[in-house]
């Protein structure tokens, strides 16, 4: 039995939603992965009379495709889609059977209009929380458009293929045999990358907003909901809705929710925002902000939006270590997400740069996968919580180096080592390894506001207790501000504060 009793009980409910007959075409060998895949497929077929199984010769073995009767959909799983990809399998079964996907009709129409042949391949790991978004988006595109096919490839089942392509980060997507992209991508982002996204003309007729929120993370979502509930015209411009929360695996300090994952919380935020009359403009990057009679926000696509007030909630991103080799070997051994990319370094030696909570958590996670972890901390002592340090020092395959100034990440086609300077002795040292995980904190996404609003030396927007900035009518919230702490729950509170501050400003002006 591949599926445990709890999963089978949940799956039984979804099986009732299958609308039409589907055929699982299976290509299997004598290896253990093939046997496990066959067991999974047979178990699925036993749970619904609408699922049948056929043997087939597919491009990869082991693999299976999900098809309509008499029609190949192009949806293929190479490997066993369990772990984080089990949801991708369930959605594929439902959508291939005829159940409509839960996306805007406008997006569905964009997918259906795509012409030409597009053969996508996504390389994933079953522990990657960013991968399902990509897999599910590409599967959906394959179901909607016969010109598109997609194969999900589990890197653990196809190690030789992954190594031959020098793939060291997931998800990594190939299109028609060429590299297409890596990292989390939503359906809208994929369409934009293919040249089928939203252009400036679609913003031309928008009336001025009362409040325009720039950023779609926890602070932005909170601000938008609070202003919309006041009955004023609200818009949200977001580069990707959910923000950095999408890259957070485990969340256990969001009060009233014992434990959740970033993507789940981001989905809940978006669902909540959509309950209100809020104009959400996703996949849009802000370029310039200017105050005239109204605020004018210029987007990268050339569109200009106008608003009486603006709330900046652009968040923050992972800080780069800014040494030679970091950008050259990004996704070729340099990584920022241990949950996603850790499994690709199984049995190898890696370094973690950073001794704060995120760095030590990464080192602990990686120690269970890789051969050895070297932690490099610039300061004389680690900054992580004591409970994390205690756990770290109990691990036999971890070395901690303090007073270490990273000088260079070395490599050829991929990372082969890291060079650092001992800050006490001045001695330069080199460690041979295959991966470097950078975990040194955050930098606010405020560079585009240079000269527009007062910021501190860290680039954080300075705000008062109402969320107001140095510019009347301009407010800010969340990790892009000079808040004392960067936490999801604090960002949400600051978003509400900025929203109420903006509403009060509108009343008085």
Curated annotation (Swiss-Prot):
| Region entry Membrane-binding, spans | 1-183
Q: What is its EC number?
A: 7.1.1.2
**Catalysed transformations (reactions):** a ubiquinone + NADH + 5 H(+)(in) = a ubiquinol + NAD(+) + 4 H(+)(out)
- Keyword Flavoprotein found: yes
Give the intrachain disulfide bonds: 337-340
* Cofactor notes: Binds 1 FAD per subunit.
**Keyword Membrane listed:** yes
A Pfam family reported for this protein in Swiss-Prot or TrEMBL: Pyr_redox_2
Residues engaged in binding NAD(+): 349-379
Q: Which PROSITE patterns match?
A: GLUTAREDOXIN_2, PYRIDINE_REDOX_2
Task: List where this protein forms a coiled coil.
Answer: none
Instruction: Report the record's Gene Ontology biological process terms.
Output: cell redox homeostasis; response to reactive oxygen species
Binding of FAD occurs at: 210-241, 469-479
Keywords carried by this UniProt record: Cell membrane, Disulfide bond, Electron transport, FAD, Flavoprotein, Membrane, NAD, Oxidoreductase, Redox-active center, Translocase, Transport, Ubiquinone
**Positions of region (Catalytic):** 184-509
List the signal peptide residues: none
Q: How does this chain sit within the bilayer?
A: Peripheral membrane protein
> Where does it reside?
Cell membrane
Q: Name the cofactor(s).
A: FAD
List the Gene Ontology MF annotations in alphabetical order: flavin adenine dinucleotide binding; NAD binding; NADH dehydrogenase (ubiquinone) activity; NADH-dependent peroxiredoxin activity; thioredoxin-disulfide reductase (NADPH) activity
One GO cellular component term of this record is: plasma membrane
Quaternary data: Homodimer.
Please state which protein family the record places this protein in: Belongs to the class-II pyridine nucleotide-disulfide oxidoreductase family.
Protein's job: Transfer of electrons from NADH to the respiratory chain. The immediate electron acceptor for the enzyme is believed to be ubiquinone.
Q: What protein does this entry describe?
A: NADH dehydrogenase
Per the UniProt record, the source organism is Bacillus subtilis (strain 168)
Q: Which gene encodes it?
A: ahpF
């Amino acid at each position: 039995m591949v599926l445990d009793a709890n999963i089978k009980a949940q799956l039984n409910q979804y099986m009732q939603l299958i609308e039409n007959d589907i055929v699982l075409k299976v290509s299997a060998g004598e290896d253990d992965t093939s046997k496990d895949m066959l067991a999974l497929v047979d178990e699925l077929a036993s749970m619904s009379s609408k699922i049948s199984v056929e043997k087939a010769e597919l491009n990869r073995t082991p693999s299976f495709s999900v098809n309509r009767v008499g029609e190949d959909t192009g949806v293929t799983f190479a490997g066993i889609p369990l772990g984080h990809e089990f949801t991708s399998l369930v959605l594929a079964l439902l959508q291939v059977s005829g159940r409509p996907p839960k996306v805007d009709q406008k997006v569905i129409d964009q997918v259906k209009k795509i012409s030409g042949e597009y053969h996508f391949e996504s390389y994933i790991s079953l522990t990657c929380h960013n991968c399902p978004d990509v897999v599910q988006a590409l599967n959906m595109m394959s179901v909607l458009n016969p010109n598109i096919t997609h194969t999900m490839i589990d890197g653990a089942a196809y190690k030789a293929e992954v190594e031959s392509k020098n793939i060291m980060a997931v998800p990594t997507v190939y299109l028609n045999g060429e590299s297409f992209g890596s990292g989390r991508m939503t359906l809208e982002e994929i369409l934009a990358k293919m040249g089928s996204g939203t252009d400036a003309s679609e913003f031309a007729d928008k009336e001025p907003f009362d409040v325009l929120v720039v950023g779609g993370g926890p602070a932005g979502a909170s601000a938008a909901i609070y202003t919309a509930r006041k009955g004023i015209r609200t818009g949200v411009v977001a580069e990707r809705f959910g923000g950095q929360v999408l890259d957070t695996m485990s969340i256990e300090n969001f009060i009233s929710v014992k434990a959740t994952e970033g993507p789940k919380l981001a989905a809940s935020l978006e669902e909540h925002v959509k309950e209100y009359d809020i104009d959400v403009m996703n996949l849009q990057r802000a370029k310039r902000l200017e105050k005239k009679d109204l605020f004018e926000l210029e987007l990268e696509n050339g569109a200009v939006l106008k608003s009486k007030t603006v709330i900046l909630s652009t968040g923050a991103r992972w800080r780069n270590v800014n040494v030679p080799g970091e950008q050259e070997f990004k996704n070729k051994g340099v990584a920022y997400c241990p949950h996603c990319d850790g499994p690709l370094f199984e049995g190898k030696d890696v370094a973690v740069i950073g001794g704060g909570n995120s760095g030590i958590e990464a080192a602990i996670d990686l120690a269970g996968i890789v051969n050895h972890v070297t932690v490099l901390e610039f300061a004389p002592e680690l900054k992580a919580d004591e409970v994390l340090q205690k756990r770290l020092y109990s691990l036999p395959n971890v070395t901690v180096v303090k007073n270490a100034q990273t000088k260079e990440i070395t490599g050829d086609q991929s990372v082969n080592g890291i060079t650092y300077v001992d800050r006490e002795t001045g001695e330069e040292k080199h460690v041979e390894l295959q991966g470097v995980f950078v975990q040194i904190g955050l930098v606010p996404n405020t560079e585009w506001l240079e000269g527009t609003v007062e910021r501190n030396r860290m680039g954080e927007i300075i705000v008062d207790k109402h969320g107001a900035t140095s510019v009347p009518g301009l407010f800010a919230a969340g990790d892009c501000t000079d808040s004392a702490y960067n936490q999801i729950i604090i960002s949400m509170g600051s978003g509400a504060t900025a929203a109420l501050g903006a509403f009060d400003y509108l009343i008085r002006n």
